[in-house]
């Protein structure tokens, strides 16, 4: 019956997860349309590929749709959703459409609170180098492919599995990865960490009897749930009991060198073209899957050496020049942009920057994401943000939430100041962030812009300001 569905409409098509699925379906021969509130690189790419994208939401946008796909960000009173209900057009949540794609291939699903996008990208890159030509759907731009999705001719599909709304429980993969489990998106789990842990256990139960759960043994919560998992397990990480174990890891000229040891295999020397110990862990997950699927170590080594990363995951913009102002001489600073918005991710990126740029002053421009996350992880943010040398703190990016008393940027800045390890500069309006950075930066600094909200536009503004120097 699926042949009767020809026209698929995406409500919120510009989102990272939505646009990737839309691109794969477009390449499968479906007619794709979609709507979003604004244009971005993803919508422009889809238009170039043949999709019809409309700015703004209206009932007439779904006039020819046989089905519509929605993300969790789309409200039930959206005019396109309302019109679809009235016309009895099937409304498919994004995760369910991803599950349908996974039925067409053998699925490899990457789950975990942190590291999903990079790990998914590493797995896709290694399998591609190994000749398996996978389909992939990633929550960020895979730089080497210039896209966040690709329809491959091979039998595997590699995709992120989203725990934020528990939608990963819709997937039926043959291989799963769990990178780590931390408290985030706790409203989905009634603020009960035990329920979050149980959801990951149930995720592994989606595997067939011959499926494999690839688990990071470095994570204490992953170790805690392992006795509840009744599937084949491969472990990875730095832990001495990990089956795929990284040893002798060190940062060299902005990338990581390490050795992988595993019973039945010769030690493998790896040069990973990404900084940070957390990326060594992510690479070990890719190595475990590559070996499970018969990819040669030589192909794996080549893919990891040539891996160019993912958009907004420690993206390096090179050196940015600035002019002399008053008593400050002209100079330049290294600019890095990152999507991290959880204290664990922030700590990992700061650590990676210390390794990639030893001895240089670290300036962090951070935009908290969501009032609920800022409230729930307030003390963790104070602890982590205090480890930078200079902090520019933006107001919280609401992401549709209403403000919460004492969970705003100004309160967080005050708490950091009281803690006494860093004296933050509070930047109330994100449009002022580029100029603020240019005013305080010194020659030789490393500037990291970080967050999941509108701070993503700051690097481009800094580059524009450099061009005017």
UniProtKB/Swiss-Prot annotation:
It catalyses: UDP-N-acetyl-alpha-D-muramate + L-alanine + ATP = UDP-N-acetyl-alpha-D-muramoyl-L-alanine + ADP + phosphate + H(+). The keyword Cytoplasm applies. Pfam families: Mur_ligase (PF01225), Mur_ligase_C (PF02875), Mur_ligase_M (PF08245). One of its GO terms (cellular component) is cytoplasm. It is found in: Cytoplasm. Pathway: Cell wall biogenesis; peptidoglycan biosynthesis. It comes from the Bacteria. Its main location: cytoplasm. Belongs to the MurCDEF family. Cell wall formation. This is UDP-N-acetylmuramate--L-alanine ligase. It comes from Herminiimonas arsenicoxydans. The gene is murC.
């Amino acid at each position: 019956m699926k042949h009767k569905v020809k026209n698929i409409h995406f409500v919120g098509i510009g989102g990272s997860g939505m646009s990737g699925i839309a691109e794969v379906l477009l390449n499968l021969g479906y007619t794709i349309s979609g709507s979003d509130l604004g244009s971005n690189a993803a919508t422009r790419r889809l238009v170039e590929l043949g999709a019809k994208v409309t700015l703004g939401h209206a009932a007439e946008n779904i006039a020819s749709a046989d089905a519509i796909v929605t993300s969790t960000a789309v409200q039930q009173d959206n005019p396109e959703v309302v019109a679809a209900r009235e016309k009895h057009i099937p409304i498919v949540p994004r995760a369910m459409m991803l599950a349908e794609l996974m039925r067409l291939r053998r699925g490899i699903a990457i789950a975990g609170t942190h590291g999903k996008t990079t790990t998914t990208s590493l797995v896709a890159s290694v399998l591609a180098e190994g000749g398996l030509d996978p389909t992939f759907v990633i929550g960020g731009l895979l730089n080497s492919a210039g896209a966040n999705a690709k329809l491959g001719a091979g039998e595997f599909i590699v995709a992120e599995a989203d725990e934020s709304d528990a939608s990963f429980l819709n997937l039926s993969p043959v291989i799963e990865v769990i990178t780590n489990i931390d408290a985030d998106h706790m409203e989905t789990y009634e603020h009960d960490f035990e329920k979050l842990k149980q959801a990951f256990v149930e995720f592994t139960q989606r595997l067939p009897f011959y499926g494999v759960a690839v688990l990071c043994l470095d994570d204490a919560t992953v170790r805690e749930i392992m006795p509840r998992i009744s599937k084949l397990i491969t472990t990875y990480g730095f832990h001495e009991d990990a089956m795929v174990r990284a040893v002798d890891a060190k940062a060299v000229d902005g990338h990581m060198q390490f050795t992988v040891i595993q019973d039945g295999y010769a030690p493998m020397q790896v040069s990973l073209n990404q900084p940070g110990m957390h990326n060594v862990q992510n690479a070990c997950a890719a190595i475990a899957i590559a070996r499970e699927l018969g990819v040669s170590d030589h192909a794996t080594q080549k893919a990891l050496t040539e891996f160019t990363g993912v958009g907004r995951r420690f993206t390096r913009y090179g050196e940015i020049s600035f002019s002399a102002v008053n008593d400050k001489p002209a100079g330049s600073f290294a600019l890095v942009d990152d999507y991290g918005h959880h204290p664990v991710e922030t700590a990992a990126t700061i650590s990676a920057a210390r390794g990639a740029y030893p001895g240089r002053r670290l300036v962090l421009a951070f935009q908290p994401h969501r009032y609920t996350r800022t409230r729930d992880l307030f003390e963790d943010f104070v602890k982590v943000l205090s480890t930078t040398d200079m902090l520019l703190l933006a107001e919280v990016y609401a992401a549709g939430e209403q403000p919460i008393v004492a969970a705003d940027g100004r309160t967080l800045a005050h708490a950091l100041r009281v803690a006494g390890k860093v004296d933050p500069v509070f930047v109330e309006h994100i449009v002022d962030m580029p100029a603020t950075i240019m005013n305080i930066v010194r020659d030789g600094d490393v500037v990291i812009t970080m967050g999941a909200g509108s701070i993503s536009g700051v690097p481009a503004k800094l580059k524009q300001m450099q061009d005017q120097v």
